[in-house]
A protein has these predicted regions:
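Alpha-helical transmembrane segments in inner-membrane proteins
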Residues: 1-343
């Protein structure tokens, strides 16, 4: 069941792994169940039948219908899109860096995005839209700078990319701390709230751009998925097999950075999902390939589960989703280290 099978349709041939396909179906089912639970969770609790009727516009309670369609559904869809983007981006970063702990932090995107947001908040007292745009621009510039600094001659190796990313991230982290202590209390609190990441007050204006961004980037990632697997054999072996190593690596880095930018613009920086999603997906599928699709589904499931847990634990005030994912991520890392007997 773990082997590779071929599905032939005339002149077309599609390779697939039965276990990976089954895992994706299971993850999709779990995600739908969590989404349904979230649509019924809140100050106005709703049953599955009421949620379904409200989604179809046939609810008997107009207030419940408005809450489901205008408040809860955009939040749930944003969580799905953000989780999927981070999960697939994490799978790409882990493959490129040859590091199971790889994430967007590897090339400093998250720290760079935080720097852009903090500068806008502390120095310019900007609102949410300007803050998100500044975070996007700063994150992309940071990622580009790391890639350029990591180039040695015509190539940017995976380990060199990691080391340069760690150095740039550490420098920006110090700058962020300096900016936070120089701002007034209100600005610092707002900056910290943005840095925590949140799904609160998400609307359709957050859903549509994220959906369009993923619609453009996911096909590119899946198209280069096979080449990404070949890159894991090493640059020399991949080049001998006809893969344009540096071009494919740069293209995949840009795709992964774009996905992370989409997620950051929609919900702010969210920890843990890009790290754990691909790892858990690989354990579930037991596949040697890069878990792009299963990693995306696992990321969506993890973020939905974290949001549901946060709402169940705090009915009075919704906890920032970044806080919940950070807590889960800490326990996951401890479990991972204990399991591998590294401590």
């Amino acid at each position: 069941m773990n082997g590779l099978h071929a599905l032939r349709l005339g002149s077309l041939s599609l390779r697939w792994r039965p276990r990976a396909a089954l895992a994706c179906l299971v993850l999709a089912g779990v995600g739908l169940a969590l989404a349904a639970a979230l649509l019924g969770t809140g100050s106005l609790a709703l049953g599955p039948a009421e949620v379904f009727a409200s989604l179809l516009g046939q609810g008997q309670d107009p207030t419940a219908q408005r809450i489901v369609q205008r408040v809860r559904l955009p939040r749930v869809l944003t969580a799905c899109l953000v989780g999927a983007a981070l999960g697939m981006a994490g799978a790409i970063f882990q493959s490129i860096s040859s590091n199971p702990l790889g994430s967007p932090d590897v090339i400093g995107f998250t720290t760079g995005a935080a720097s852009g947001a903090i500068v806008q908040i502390i120095l310019f007292d900007a609102g949410p839209l300007a803050t998100s745009l500044a975070a996007l621009a700063a994150g992309l510039c940071t990622a580009l700078a790391v890639v350029l600094l990591a180039r040695r001659g015509a190539t940017a190796g995976g380990y060199r990319l990691v080391l340069v990313g760690i150095g740039v991230g550490a420098s920006l982290s110090g700058l962020n701390s300096l900016l936070l202590v120089t701002g007034n209390l209100d600005q610092a609190m707002y900056a910290q709230l943005w840095l925590a990441g949140s799904l609160n007050t998400r609307t359709w204006s957050h859903v549509v751009p994220a959906a369009l961004g993923l619609l453009a980037s996911v096909p590119l990632a899946l198209y280069h998925g096979r080449r990404l697997e070949v890159l894991e054999l090493g640059d020399a072996s991949a080049a001998q097999l006809g893969v344009a190593v540096e071009r494919v690596r740069l293209q995949m880095v840009l795709v992964a950075v774009g996905m992370t930018a989409i997620a950051t613009a929609a919900a702010g920086p969210i920890a843990f999902i890009a790290l754990a999603g691909p790892q858990l997906a690989r354990r579930l599928t037991r596949s040697a390939g890069v878990p792009l699709l299963s990693g995306a589904l696992m990321g969506a499931v993890l973020l939905l589960a974290a949001d549901l847990l946060g709402q169940r634990l705090a009915y009075v005030a919704n906890l920032p989703i970044g806080l919940m994912t950070g807590l889960l991520g800490g326990f996951y890392l401890l479990w991972l280290l204990l399991r591998s007997r590294r401590i």
